[in-house]
Structures are given as C-alpha cells and as structure tokens.
C-alpha cells in the first residue's frame, strides 16, 4: 500500500493483541524510524521504538488509555516549529506502519525527559550552556502500535467518510487542481478532532494558519498541524506536484496563528 492510499484507509486502533510483532517486522519498523525527514533541519528529532510496551504503560499509569505491545516515542529539542515538525515526522511513520499491516494510535504524551532516560539514549547537554533549554531533548509524542485485536478492523472502508469538516471549511477558494490534495488534509487526524488547520489560497499557493485553541491542548494542536502538512506533502508527491514549504510571513487573522506558506513551484516557473 502506498502512503497516499494509507491516508484514506488509516484509522486509530485502540484494542491490541498482546502478541508482539515478528522480529523481522520489528527490524523493518526500526529501519524506517531511522529514515526520517522534516522541515526544520536545525532540529534534532529522533524516533525511538520501545518494543517492551510495559515500560510505557508503567510510566504513564492510568493516563495510558491504549495498551499495546509496542510504542514509539518521538523526542526533539526546542526550536522553530518543533512540535509541527514532530507531527510531520511521526505521521509518515504511522502511515508506513499501516502499510506494513500494523495498527496504530496517537497518544497524548505527558512523559518528561527524566522518565525515559533509563531506556532511551538522549544526548547530554551542559547545564551551563546558555542555550540549554533549547538544546535539550525531551519526549513530545507517543504512538501505540502492534497487531490489532481480531475483532478490530485494521482499515477504514474507503467509502466511509470520517467525522471531519467540509472541504470549504479547510480552504477558501479551492482550485480544482488542489481538490484531492486538500481532501487528504481534511481527513487528517487531530487532537480531540479539533481540525485546527485553515488554508488560504494566494497567487503563489497557500498560507497555512492554525486556529487558536485551549492552552491544555496547545502542544497537541501544533503536532496536529504537522500531521496535516505531511498529508499535503504526501498527496503532492503522489500527483507529481512540485511544492516547497516556506515561512514568508502573512497577514494576521483573528483567532488564528500563521504557521507557514506552501509555494507552488510549477506556477512560479510558469511566471518566469
């Protein structure tokens, strides 16, 4: 299954078999977790496979609502749009796992750096370093994965429409060229299904905004924005559409924060 197809078929699985995945498959998972790309190359994002799921369950306690045999923990230092970049990285991992026939579920991460040091190797930063707070790595996202319980359907029916906003709520003034790409964004998962993304068309592509949300889920909302950008990126690659992500600034909009712009390179080439 291609990543673009996985976008339409994916769904969150909350019930897992206790059986661990095969060792050969686990090696494949670890390999793809080491092969990641993100938008801000100054960040130090890493994806850690925790094959002993009980470690995460113990640390999270009652907050661990999804019991799975394995988990993935994503760590990063703080930097420009680090949470959005985490979402961008992790959603591709999720879609690749789905393509391998594995169930997945995003979890809210309340773990701290000191919680995971015993089983995750994080870089040491001198506490006297003036940039200590921005350089130090910490966990920000968790993904449960494994084999789904027998009664759980791994994939969503291609004909079913998830509980999402209509496309006109996602983007204003849609060019038909972008319809399928933006629909891939529309069906992206988000914290509490808030779907915080809004795309505004401009002569060069799109300006992307995040709707302001409650402080209690602000971090997860930013991660959700990164997930939406990854869906946009995958769909563009599927249709051979040449784009780039840039932070070029845009007008302020009430109740929304500007994230970045998406430039249609094909349109700019035509202009030249």
Describe the residue ranges of each PLM region.
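Acidic, surface-exposed loops and disordered segments
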Residues: 1-272
């Amino acid at each position: 299954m291609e990543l673009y197809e996985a976008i339409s078929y994916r769904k969150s699985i909350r019930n897992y078999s206790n059986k661990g995945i095969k060792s050969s498959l686990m090696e494949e998972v670890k390999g793809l977790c080491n092969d990641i790309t993100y938008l801000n190359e100054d960040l130090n994002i890493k994806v850690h496979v925790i094959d002993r799921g009980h470690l995460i369950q113990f640390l999270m306690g009652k907050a661990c609502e999804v019991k799975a045999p394995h988990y993935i923990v994503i760590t990063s230092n703080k930097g420009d749009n680090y949470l959005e970049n985490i979402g961008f990285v992790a959603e591709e991992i999720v879609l690749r796992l789905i393509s391998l026939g594995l169930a997945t579920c995003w979890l809210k991460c309340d773990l701290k750096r000191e919680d995971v040091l015993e089983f995750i190797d994080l870089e040491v930063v001198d506490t006297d370093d003036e940039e200590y707070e921005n350089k130090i790595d910490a966990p920000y996202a968790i993904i449960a994965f494994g084999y789904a319980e027998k009664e759980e359907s791994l994939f969503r029916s291609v004909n079913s429409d998830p509980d999402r906003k209509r496309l006109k709520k996602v983007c204003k003034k849609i060019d038909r060229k972008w319809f399928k790409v933006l629909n891939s964004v529309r069906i992206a998962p988000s914290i509490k299904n808030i779907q915080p993304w809004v795309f505004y068309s401009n002569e060069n592509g799109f300006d992307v905004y995040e709707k302001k949300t409650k402080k209690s889920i602000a971090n997860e909302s930013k991660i959700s924005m990164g997930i939406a950008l990854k869906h946009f990126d995958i769909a563009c690659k599927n249709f051979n559409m040449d784009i780039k992500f840039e932070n070029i600034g845009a007008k302020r909009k009430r109740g929304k924060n500007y994230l970045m712009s998406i430039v249609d390179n094909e349109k700019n080439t035509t202009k030249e």
